[in-house]
Amino acid sequence: MIALLIGAGVALLVALIGTPLFIRFLVAKSYGQFIRDDGPTSHHTKRGTPTMGGTVVVAAVLISYFVTHLIMWMMNPDSAGPSASGLLLLFLMVGMGFVGFLDDFIKISNKRSLGLNARAKLILQAAVGIIFAVLVLQFPNEDGLRPASTQISLVRDIPWLDLAFGGTVVGAILFVLWSNLIITAATNGVNLTDGLDGLAAGASIMVFGAYTIMGIWQNNQACGSPREAGSGCYQVRDPMDLALLAAILSAALVGFLWWNTSPAKIFMGDTGSLAIGGAVAAFAILSRTELLLAFIGGLFVLITLSVIIQVGFFKLSGGKRVFKMAPLQHHFELKGWDEVTVVVRFWILAGLFVAAGLGIFYAEWVVLL
């Protein structure tokens, strides 16, 4: 628990102090956001706002994670140190963040709202996702537990939903596809949510807060733990290190949100939204709560569905629309809601989804007592 407090504290300070310094750098370089003309007219005033703020969030997470482990080692040389699960999560977060950084950099360099083309972006994301999926099936600990398994999970692995039903090779291939589906859904969900000042950051703080709570609980109720109660123990590798990273991410985003809240002094850009989405997907896979992500990240799911419905209905109906504009948050803007009103109400929705996810997580454990 001390590690979580240290990590969160360092992340908060790095983000709070680092973000305004990064804003000054971006302003000096004239690196600002370009706003699409077909968006809400109220957004045109945001043109030129510094972007790529996700760079600070990623840096704060990396610094905090390794500084925390260094401090814990100095306090106790026998401490575990960085875990395989923690490093793999950082790999996916940084990898996706790098793809987003390339996209943002092309936008600001060419002074337009379009960055990487869709094919290049998809290929890069798939490459990072495939490497991650292959690696998480490796690195067994002393108990033979690996960061992930081929079994699809809800709040724990579901034995009768094993992707390795056709053998190890088939299982590995299907797991790579399944993992990339989760990664693509999470990254696109956060990316689509990042359209209003503070919306994605605030919602993500709650999501990572949930993973902090679940990681602590999984550690306390790990199979073989002295605190294990009943038959509901968890077989998750490195749950406490995952809880540490979740706490660090929440704190880093709190520090960033101080500057990103309306009126935003900086946007997270694709650098931030893809990095956060990658981290969300990694938590779902590594904590063995893949299907539960539909509840924990319910706001991201809702906003993604609004885009799918809008595009699908537009094509099938020959040009008609369900919403005034998609993603969903812009529909309410065009209905006359103030941006801050939309953001706060969507934060409330995000909190309700997170509460539902945590309720399902805990209720399953109670049933197994």
From Swiss-Prot:
Its main location: membrane. InterPro entries: Glycosyl_transferase_4, PNAcMuramoyl-5peptid_Trfase, PNAcMuramoyl-5peptid_Trfase_CS. One of its GO terms (molecular function) is metal ion binding. Catalyzes the initial step of the lipid cycle reactions in the biosynthesis of the cell wall peptidoglycan: transfers peptidoglycan precursor phospho-MurNAc-pentapeptide from UDP-MurNAc-pentapeptide onto the lipid carrier undecaprenyl phosphate, yielding undecaprenyl-pyrophosphoryl-MurNAc-pentapeptide, known as lipid I. It comes from the Bacteria. GO terms for biological process: cell division; cell wall organization; peptidoglycan biosynthetic process; regulation of cell shape. It is found in: Cell membrane. Belongs to the glycosyltransferase 4 family. MraY subfamily. PANTHER family: PHOSPHO-N-ACETYLMURAMOYL-PENTAPEPTIDE-TRANSFERASE (PTHR22926), PHOSPHO-N-ACETYLMURAMOYL-PENTAPEPTIDE-TRANSFERASE HOMOLOG (PTHR22926:SF5). Its EC number is 2.7.8.13. It is an enzyme of class 2 (transferase). GO terms for cellular component: plasma membrane. Its cofactor is Mg(2+). Pathway: Cell wall biogenesis; peptidoglycan biosynthesis. It catalyses: UDP-N-acetyl-alpha-D-muramoyl-L-alanyl-gamma-D-glutamyl-meso-2,6-diaminopimeloyl-D-alanyl-D-alanine + di-trans,octa-cis-undecaprenyl phosphate = di-trans,octa-cis-undecaprenyl diphospho-N-acetyl-alpha-D-muramoyl-L-alanyl-D-glutamyl-meso-2,6-diaminopimeloyl-D-alanyl-D-alanine + UMP. This is Phospho-N-acetylmuramoyl-pentapeptide-transferase. It is a multi-pass membrane protein. The chain crosses the membrane at residues 2-22, 55-75, 86-106, 120-140, 163-183, 196-216, 239-259, 266-286, 291-311, 348-368. Keywords: Cell cycle, Cell division, Cell membrane, Cell shape, Cell wall biogenesis/degradation, Magnesium, Membrane, Metal-binding, Peptidoglycan synthesis, Transferase, Transmembrane, Transmembrane helix.
